[in-house]
Curated annotation (Swiss-Prot):
GO CC annotation terms, alphabetical: membrane
Residues annotated to bind heme b 2: H253, H321
Signal peptide stretch: 1-23
Entry binding sites for heme b 1: H220, H285
Keyword entries, A-Z: Electron transport, Heme, Iron, Membrane, Metal-binding, Signal, Transmembrane, Transmembrane helix, Transport
Name of the protein in question: Cytochrome b561 and DOMON domain-containing protein At3g61750
Cofactor stoichiometry and binding remark: Binds 2 heme b groups non-covalently.
PROSITE patterns: CYTOCHROME_B561, DOMON
Taxonomic lineage from the root: Eukaryota, Viridiplantae, Streptophyta, Embryophyta, Tracheophyta
Localization of this protein: Membrane
Length: 398
């Protein structure tokens, strides 16, 4: 019991319409590409001033995994953040009056083999390699330094540029290469490229997608809290402190545990669907979720493989069942806290809600344990039951 109280105290402390696009060879944009807009919060890793405005920028999936975020002020200064999946080489975005690569100016970014972030402006005088001139171009970059950042599997290029006139629709060139530029900054030939026409006058393109994703996150969180934060802990409490009500405690325990398992399974399924849509960089939350699915499945299978009370194996089964249950509840609580902290729409509501559930559960454990030690509850004889005592036809956890 002391171990469980410590686990929950630890968890409590931890808790403290798309713009118009046209292209000559743009691939079909699926839901997974669209939801790259919401995979990461740019304010978490981009420096100011990009971090101050990036979360409110219109977000447009353009081509393959290229995603464009932008904002423009009254002085025609545009803040642009372009991102794409990255392994090696370089990625770039260029601007051209006619949409042609020759004569365009481009911002190219990459992470060197030594892990250094590089970003340069290039002027494309022609199609030959020596005609792609580094540190030249017609883009009027502002005093704010351009930056390039690698976060998870995505690379982000951010810069500010001033255009002479406000043009709602602009030709944007996108390209990438898996080969690094030379030490002198000379670009290698691109592996693929495309040109798109972006309507920068539209600023509400991603609302419907974000709303859908936010709803799915809410469902995922509710299922996880109901399953791992409420039903399964209550089932464990019933198994430990209601055994003087035999066999009622057993049927209640089984009912709560199986219902909690169903809710937990639903949370995992919704989580997998969310991950496939938005590809977030959450290895800890995702890994613990899969780990919990394995543990909870083992608990269900253990129920059907429960040996008779008189057999020698029953003691070892009890140990297994109890400790797997305790470990599952601990990691379930930790993963709920991680999910709330990483949710971009979490707010105080989730923290207060789960904080209340966690506090009530912890208080119930403490009060009931005091009664159990005094012999008021916990066994038919009103005495503290021996360690791992089980009903002949039952299974317990925690």
């Amino acid at each position: 019991m002391k171990t469980l109280v410590g686990f929950y105290i630890l968890c409590f402390l931890i808790g403290q319409d798309l713009p118009f696009l046209a292209a000559d060879d743009v691939n079909v944009i699926n839901d997974s590409t669209q939801n790259l807009c919401f995979a990461n919060r740019l304010s978490d890793f981009l420096p100011p001033p990009y971090s101050n405005i990036s979360d409110n920028m219109p977000c447009t999936p353009l081509w393959n995994t290229f995603v464009l975020r932008y904002s423009e002020n009254r002085d025609n200064v545009m803040t642009i953040i372009v991102s794409a999946l990255y392994t090696t080489g370089w990625v770039g975005i260029g601007f051209s009056k006619e949409g042609r690569m020759v004569g365009s100016s481009a911002m190219i970014g990459w992470i060197s083999k030594k892990g250094h972030a590089k970003i340069k402006q290039y002027y494309l005088q022609g199609t030959e390699r020596d005609q792609v001139v580094p540190d030249q171009g017609e883009l009027q970059l502002q005093k704010v330094p351009p930056v390039v950042a690698l976060h998870g599997a995505m690379i982000y290029l951010a810069f500010q540029v001033k255009f002479a006139v406000r043009v709602p629709r602009r030709a944007v060139i996108l390209a990438f290469s898996t080969a690094y530029p030379s030490k002198l900054g000379r670009l290698t030939k691109h592996d693929d490229k495309t040109t798109v026409i972006v309507d920068f006058s539209k600023a509400s393109g991603a609302t419907s997608i974000k709303t859908t994703t936010s709803t799915e996150k809410t469902k995922h969180g509710v299922m996880a809290i109901l399953g791992w934060g409420f039903l399964l802990p209550v089932g464990a409490i019933l198994a430990r402190y209601l055994r003087h009500k035999d066999p009622l405690w057993y049927y209640l325990h089984i009912g709560f545990q199986f219902t909690g398992f169903i809710f937990g399974l639903a949370a995992v399924i919704l989580g997998i669907q969310l991950y496939n849509r938005i590809q977030p960089d959450i290895p800890a939350h995702r890994g613990i979720g899969i780990f919990l699915l394995v543990l909870s499945t083992l608990q269900v299978l253990a129920f059907f493989a429960r040996p008779q009370k008189e057999t020698k194996m029953r003691r070892y089964w009890n140990w297994y069942h109890h400790w797997i249950g305790r470990i599952s509840l601990f990691f379930g609580a930790v993963n709920i806290v991680l999910g709330i902290r990483m949710a971009d729409n979490g707010g105080d509501g989730w923290k207060i809600g789960y904080g209340f559930v966690l506090s009530v559960t912890l208080l119930a454990f403490v009060v009931l344990e005091i009664f159990r030690i005094r012999g008021t509850i916990g066994s038919p004889s009103s005495r503290s039951p021996p360690s791992f005592e089980t009903h002949p036809s039952s299974s317990t956890s925690v």
